């Protein structure tokens, strides 16, 4: 059986993200008492991912299912390995497309987080 996968190992793509991020700690004072509070805001950005491996499961009836092992690309290298089915990987998401989607989602849903895939 000849099985062709849609994406190769090393394929990179971008996904939109919108979530709460703690941006600063405020020091509050009242009548001699002091305490801190973490302040968060919703941020929108694009995250790059890379395919590291491919898993193909062939069933007894001759059908098959393809999943991809994917890692996030960060400034520190790669992290957070996850498995995704083929249909959950976007074909041509550029950083600009993912960023625009994230910003649009944040504008339309100001209190909701979105993690793409």
Where do the language-model regions lie?
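Mixed-charge, Lys/Arg-rich low-complexity intrinsically disordered regions
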Residues: 1-12, 19-22
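Aromatic side chains
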Residues: 7, 13-14, 64, 68
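Short regulatory "switch" loops immediately downstream of catalytic or recognition motifs
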Residues: 15-26, 71-72
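Short beta-strand-centered aromatic/proline hotspots
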Residues: 23-59
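Intrinsically disordered, low-complexity, charged/polar segments
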Residues: 44-47, 52-117
